[in-house]
Amino acid sequence: MKRPDRLAVGRVVASWWLPTVIACAVGALYVFYSVAQWRALVVPSWDLGIFAEAVQAYSRFEAPIVPIKGPGYNLLGDHFHPILALLGPVYRLFPSALTLLVVQDVLIAASVVPVARLAQRLLGRGGALLVGFAYGLGWGLQGAVGAQFHEVCVAVPLLALGGVAFVERRWGACMAWLAPLVLVKEDLGLTVFMAGLAITWRGRSEGRPAVLRGLAYALFGIVAFVVTVKLLLPAMNPAGTWAYSLDGSATGAGTPMGGSTAAREVPSPWAVLTSPPVKLATLLVLLAGAGFVGASSPWFALVLPTLAWRFAGSVDTYYVWDSWHYNAVLVPIAACSLLDVINRWLAPERAAVGDDTDSENDAPASPTRGRRAGAWAVACVPALSLAITASALPLWQLPTLTEDPRMAAAQGALDAVPEGASVETDTTLLARLVPGREVYWVGTSGTMDTPPEYVVIDVRSYAWGGQQVDAESWGSAAHPGHTYETIYSKAGFRVARRTS
């Protein structure tokens, strides 16, 4: 039996250990942040509860019926994300919404490995540290972690792996990594379409078969998008439509997060880009994440579908750069676009010294000082942007995330609702009540055939807009003909049980 080549093993270890360490550091920081959020009772929206109900259903091999969205609501008719079924076994082992937060942190951290590894090949270990941490702690990834779990976290490592494969001209691997995006969210089929066009353009010198392959892949992306939004989503949506239209007036856009969703006319192209001004800030931060020069890479075109539906929409939160989860898909695209440009800058010098593009050696070749200085200069831009914007990003608030003094009272309210019960609640304990229970949100439960057995209210929840409420009277008023009695009241948490 032939022994492994020690030199080959050493090269593999050298190319992997530092990117892995960077990813682990980023992941540990994000997990620490998520746990701190959890202990501080921070609830940005109802979304974590929604996804917890969906994944809980998957863990039981059931359709993702999510009562939080409404009685009998199939979440596959909201956004199309069947890939979340893969999280069912994990949730079955660890049935908690906190599990989803940790899974998201791990997926984001995993995306750091290919990006940092490519940076290491191009710029050495210093480049891996610089690009790896600037990417891993990037604006959109921090925003996703701060906004808590969403389906797009699955897209982040896929985009990172696909982007690195594009830079290295491994077209088959690039297409394989990106194909599952059509199962993550419906609009990502358009991102796959743009990837096909980018592959076609970059591979045009390889002959007609390469061009046809790229065009076929682009066709796959556009067909997947059309089939999803025209057939699959309407078939599973209770209203028989695609729930998220550009004007924000469709059935799915309004969530208890704040922000206007009023329908309006589609604005002019100039207004789409510049009004309100926060759009310009988002574009600036995105370009900085690509070192500005990354915008010249054909890979950067993958940001266009996401920016198009966001900027053309009328929901205020679509435009922001500092706190929205859908920015996450832009960050790996920008990082890989930057590395693509750096790779092209340094490629002639590497070729001159006989360097192989796919070498596992972490030591960079020795191009001219000017090219290398330019590469380092643009590689520093994302880190500089991160430093400038850090105080506006979620991790800056980490020192303030201390355990809520009402945690014991919150746990008491949870314990008052037995497993197997149906319960209606506001946002504060929404996700925490999901394991083993049928959970409804107070804003979507009006069409229930049978009122919930329990009502749980946090009088301090933003869901009430400062109004004075209690579980007993609210439950009786919301469900005429039925009465509730208070069985738990402590530190603003109220639990009422249905008595008739």
Which residues does each predicted region cover?
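Start-transfer (signal-anchor) and selected internal transmembrane alpha helices
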Residues: 1-32, 171, 213-217
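Signature aromatic-anchored transmembrane alpha helix within multi-pass, membrane-resident enzymes
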Residues: 20-24, 126, 218-222, 345-391
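Extracytosolic helix-loop segments that constitute the early lumenal/periplasmic catalytic or substrate-binding loops
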Residues: 32, 50-74, 82-83
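Transmembrane-helix motifs of polytopic, lipid-linked glycan transferases
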Residues: 98-122
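Specific aromatic-rich, kink-prone transmembrane helix
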Residues: 114, 134, 153-177
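Perimembrane helix-loop-helix junctions
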Residues: 191-221
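Hydrophobic, aromatic-rich transmembrane alpha-helices
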Residues: 274-307
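Hydrophobic/aromatic-rich transmembrane helices and adjacent perimembrane loops
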Residues: 301-365
